[in-house]
Amino acid sequence: MANTPHGGVLKDLLSRDQPIRGELLKESETLASILLSERQLCDLELILSGGFSPLEGFMNEKDYNGVVNDLRLADGALFSMPITLDVSQEDIDELKLKAGGRYTLRDFRDDSPLAIITVDDIYRPDKAVEAKKVFRGDPEHPAVKYLYNTAKEFYVGGKIQAINKLNHYDYVGLRYTPAELRQEFGKLGWNKVVAFQTRNPMHRAHRELTVRAARSRQANVLIHPVVGLTKPGDIDHFTRVRVYQALLPRYPNGMALLGLLPLAMRMGGDREAMWHAIIRKNYGATHFIVGRDHAGPGKNSKGEEFYGPYDAQKLVEKYKDELGIEVVPFQMMTYLPDSDEYMPKDEVPEGTKTLDISGTELRKRLKFGLPIPEWFSYPEVVKVLRESHPPRAKQGFTIFLTGHYNSGKDAIARALQVSLNQQAGRTTTLLLGETVRSELSAELGFSREDRHKNVQRIAFVAAELTRAGSAVIAAPIAPHEAGRKEARETVEQGGNFFLVHVNTPLEYCEATDRKGRFAAAKRGEIKGFTGVDDEYEVPSNADLVVDASQTQVRTIVHQIILLLESQGFFGN
């Protein structure tokens, strides 16, 4: 029998409101609409399905303040994470948002109506208090950054009525709602279920850990990975789900089940662990594995952890009776080569030989095509990871050349394209500054804002091509540090980026300017010309600095090729 939902009743709004769906759908077309962001969609999906029970909507001010300050909703029920719908003053004015009003919540992807919210209140949160009490206040914490840089200034609280489920087109058969998963447990005759939360690929150690946890409690295993929003830089959920599917047959027959959780993680450490436990209880689990530094975002720029290693376990353990789900502490597993088995580190006899591979080492082995031993991960899992993360020799990259007009960027770019074509194995795309201006950014001028937009567009195109395995050579002036930084971040989300500063002196660029652009700018005929009436900000983090006034193009191209070769882009 599945565990009792948090609060005693599963708030499955989809089932509750199905009888009046037609009326709600008709009404939704007459109401002002709030277009939900990706994170808000994740939250709404779990409100609608009952994953966030006992919530029936986004938190009003009383519930929000109770959760932030005391880990409790206004009625006293435990809840550790604020679930809020943020809006701007512009939204309030444009949509005429007010208490008592009804508004349609729509999916930003296809504008489909998902629900109607009846507003309880609109309030301005104290973000400093939320940042401090919920996420401990470190400005580098990703949730704190989100609060200050992305979340809007007001929150809207109110109960929701369901119209439609969110549309998903991937792994549909694995996307159980809490009610569906509870029904599945009933079909299988499962009474005790150990839920395992993960946002990473699983290897042999994870399999051994979960099997031990289940056997010691005579229970079954729910592998319940997050496929909503996780930590930037995490392996994409498509790859991870293929990994979990490959791993599943390695469990004893009938022991494990895979289900996907559309959660937007906050990386909130101890509070997030309690939240995860509540969610798994709503999905019917009786036990929940809480790991070391559970849902922590890692380290800040000073090398300090945001949370203590066992803070999460301590908080969930403290409230375990009220939560109504048993905590299973995550045991760090290690491999014993002499006996070919995994064992919890704290149980290994002194002097016994052990082997481990860190996450950093695994990424290195994937990046350079190095062997990954079978004692660490199953061959079928490694195969999936290698397909999604090919070695450097098969990865795409972007060479981003920046410098003054007439610095030699275009000549270097054209010569580099020929040299890379000679290497074979990749398509090569050239994005010259003037070509991009005429084909992609014809309507843009040369203001700081328009220059930034131009670089953003180049970065977007480069990122897509790089992700697909191409070599991209971009050669804009890109005079501003912020634009170049954003370009690097955009491309590096799916590939490799190298910034080459073509540091040819401004005087040389002007003296050899056969088209007379510098002279025209000085006469005032061209506005916003870099080096005349717009400053060029020297890159602080270039991967290579060259000077076309002192070095031949052939030599510069060779330097770039050597840089790529040193990073493994042309094989062993």
Swiss-Prot record:
Region feature Allosteric regulation domain, mapped onto this chain: 395-572
Compartments where located: Cytoplasm
Pathway: Sulfur metabolism; hydrogen sulfide biosynthesis; sulfite from sulfate: step 1/3
Predominant cellular place of this UniProt entry's protein: cytoplasm
Activity regulation (record text): Allosterically inhibited by 3'-phosphoadenosine 5'-phosphosulfate (PAPS).
Keywords for the protein's UniProt record, in alphabetical order: Allosteric enzyme, Amino-acid biosynthesis, ATP-binding, Cysteine biosynthesis, Cytoplasm, Methionine biosynthesis, Nucleotide-binding, Nucleotidyltransferase, Transferase
Cellular compartments per GO CC: cytoplasm
UniProt cross-references to Pfam families, sorted A to Z: APS_kinase (PF01583), ATP-sulfurylase (PF01747), PUA_2 (PF14306)
GO MF term list: adenylylsulfate kinase activity; ATP binding; sulfate adenylyltransferase (ATP) activity
Binding-site residues for ATP, renumbered to this chain: 197-200, 291-294, 333
UniProt keyword Phosphoprotein present: no
This enzyme's EC code(s): 2.7.7.4
Site positions per UniProt: Induces change in substrate recognition on ATP binding: 330
UniProt-annotated stretches for the region Catalytic: 170-394
Record: residues binding 3'-phosphoadenylyl sulfate: 434-437, 451, 477-478, 515
Catalytic activity: sulfate + ATP + H(+) = adenosine 5'-phosphosulfate + diphosphate
Biological processes per GO annotation: cysteine biosynthetic process; hydrogen sulfide biosynthetic process; methionine biosynthetic process; sulfate assimilation, phosphoadenylyl sulfate reduction by phosphoadenylyl-sulfate reductase (thioredoxin)
Domain notes: The adenylyl-sulfate kinase (APS kinase) is non-functional. It is involved in allosteric regulation by PAPS. PAPS binding induces a large rotational rearrangement of domains lowering the substrate affinity of the enzyme.
NCBIfam families (alphabetical): apsK, PRK05537.1, sopT
UniProt record similarity statement: In the N-terminal section; belongs to the sulfate adenylyltransferase family. In the C-terminal section; belongs to the APS kinase family.
Quaternary data: Homohexamer. Dimer of trimers.
Protein name, UniProt field: Sulfate adenylyltransferase
